[in-house]
Each structure stands twice: as C-alpha cells, then as structure tokens.
Regions:
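A broadly used, surface-exposed interaction patch
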Residues: 43-73
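GIY-YIG nuclease catalytic motif and its immediate N-terminal context
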Residues: 1-49, 72-73
C-alpha cells in the first residue's frame, strides 16, 4: 500500500515526518494546470532545490507518494 500527502509548495510547508529526509518517494508539483513529476531519496533537499528554481515557482502544491515497500529502485 502507499500513502499520498499534500504540502504547500509556495510556503515550503511539507511537514516534519522523518520520511521526508531520507526515504525514496515520488512527488508531484502542480498548480491546477501544469504538473512536474519527480522522485528523490531526500525529498526535503530536493524541494529546496526546486523552490530555488525560477521555472518551478509556478507551482503551489506538492503531493508526496510513498510506501514502506519503496526502495532505491523507485
């Protein structure tokens, strides 16, 4: 089974769960019209990188998709 959570990309509000620091997961940045899909093992760091990118500032929401069954091959 997997879980999907939502965060506020513009305000960098993602939560403080440990899986955000060191867990393989998929994520979707979106604004209702466009989406960017990515994967990372260190999603908090990756979100900081995206937030610094002018191209990614069009997004306002982030969805994290994770599972205890995900591994490095995600």
């Amino acid at each position: 089974m997997f879980k999907i959570t939502e965060g506020d990309f513009k305000n960098q509000t993602y939560g403080d769960e440990s899986y955000l620091s060191n867990w393989p997961m998929l994520y979707i940045l979106e604004n209702g019209k466009q989406a960017y899909i990515g994967e990372s093992n260190h999603v908090k760091n990756r979100m900081s990188q995206h937030h610094s990118s002018v191209d990614k500032r069009i997004f306002d929401k982030v969805h994290f998709i994770y599972s205890s069954k995900f591994n490095q091959s995600v």
